[in-house]
Amino acid sequence: MIRLVAIDMDGTLLRPDGHISERNVRALKGLKAMGAEFLICTGRSYIDALEPLKEAGLRAPVVCMNGAAVYDWDGRLMDEIRLSERQVREILDCCQKEDIIFDFMTDRGSYTTAKEAQFRACFERNVLLPMAEFTYEGVRDRFSFAEEGQLFELGLAFYKISVIHESQEVLGRIKERLSRIQELAV
């Protein structure tokens, strides 16, 4: 008997427009009727994972940000693996010479150190979240903008950092540098 089903969101549970199809909603409700539960496993932040679930009238525990945080049915943080300030600073140092946009996923949502013009240009070139569900305004509203020095003054818990650039060559160089940081999954 199936007791638990773990489901990814992007490319699995969600349609390309970012919504859960009625067919998938029925399937998940059918699981519950059979006595099974489901949980979400995603690279998304908790806030970004919760939105399509709420819209579909579904509730589930969420393993988010590639396992960095686990939330229960009621949205309470059950477990977390934080990046240390040292790791975050090393990541910033590794990327210093590149024109990078960062998505710092934290306990208080997503932060970026990008200037708004750079952020918009990246979005318009479909480098930043190239999914149909997102408009520029919708993406912009999901981020808080901060100067690099402010990030540590805010007392944020860092869970995941996405490094965004349109060049695979640049990303390859950065990946090589980041892989040298101890206790960091790249």
Language model regions located:
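Short, small/polar residue-rich loop motifs at catalytic or cofactor-binding pockets
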Residues: 1-2, 64
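Asp-based phosphoryl-transfer active-site loop
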Residues: 3-18, 91
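A short alpha-helix capping/helix-coil boundary motif
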Residues: 5-8, 28-30, 68-72, 152-155, ...
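Active-site phosphate-binding/coordination module
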Residues: 22-129
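Conserved acidic, metal-coordinating active-site core of Asp-based
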Residues: 94, 98, 105-186
